[in-house]
Amino acid sequence: MANFKTMTHTSVSLLFLLCLLRPCLAYNVVSFGARGDGWTDSTSAFLRAWSAACRSTSQPNVYVPRGTYLVRTLNLYGPCRRRMEFRIDGTLVAPANYNAIGNSEFWIMFYKVSGLSVYGGTINAKGHGYWSCRKGGKSCPQGARSIQFMWCNNVLLKGLTSLHSQRVHVGIGYSSNVRVEKVKITAPSGSPNTDGIHVQNSRGITIYGSIIQTGDDCISIGPGSMNMWIEQIGCGPGHGISIGSLGSSNNEAGVANITVTNSVFTKTQNGVRIKSWARPSGGYARNLMFTNLIMRNVGYPILIDQNYCPHNNCPRQNSGVKVSQVTYKNVKGTSSTQQAIKFDCSYSNPCTGIRLQDIKLTHNDRFRRPAVSYCRNARGRRGGTVIPRSCF
């Protein structure tokens, strides 16, 4: 994993070093008609600037200067002739009416761009109205992800602040060699389905040095995700870092080679979680490493849930997802529930190869009840000091 992490960092670093080595041609969105007054629709200006830059034979830079720019759905298509840079010094805001982007699935989407750097600035999707619609049980649009990378390769996303997404803040799908660095993601703890970063069907993904405070998973890792390195994340509020949910279909792709390290979880619903539906599936989750983690009053610091069902109409079968080779090392802190370690695995496909090493999790309880471990259909071993006492 160390070699993969180094290669990813080196590749994406080359993208922003190029502009230091050769002149970059700037495409200022204001020159294409954008106005940073917060209420003039600048969507067409942004699209024209992107289109011109994408056709450029010089090293292009789409530039958003200081100001507040109202934009509707932005579909930024490749492939482009050169590596692209998209630099935001201002703030992008969505229309106040959530329907303006709510039916588009994505607010800002980069599609089939190979060699892309997105820097800085703030995007604010103004999701409050959409969340109210969802909570009120009304007929609502599907909701939009704030920024999505689809079929993109060699991508750097750095320094972005994402506020109040209708749904997922940052999405990565069918992409490779993507580095997300020093982003800040914020939405209220009660905002529904506002995952911070969601990765699916992608490989070679690094997420580093970021603060994620939201209403759902800080980071969610979906089927088909391979070779991920997640480090120095401040997570909370939210639902923790989750692999899954998995097992929604029989022919689902697996998840493998994931590392989560040197991160802090504060008052989250879960810490590190693997979740799968209780139904047949050919999926798997294997070669997973969770190390050097601090839990601060976290609901379930260590959790495998193979009977995942957050709502009604649960399948109530046996999960076909095979969970194996999972290591938890140097995980310390406090749990807000008594079950600090919970492995609720499949009867037909027990979890195997679980390793607990140097764990110290105490129950944050005014009655001083000790933390406990719960295991069902889980097989593994322990090393060093493990608190609470391991099932293995």
Task: Give the positions of each predicted feature.
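Extracellular/periplasmic carbohydrate-active domains that bind, remodel
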Residues: 2-392
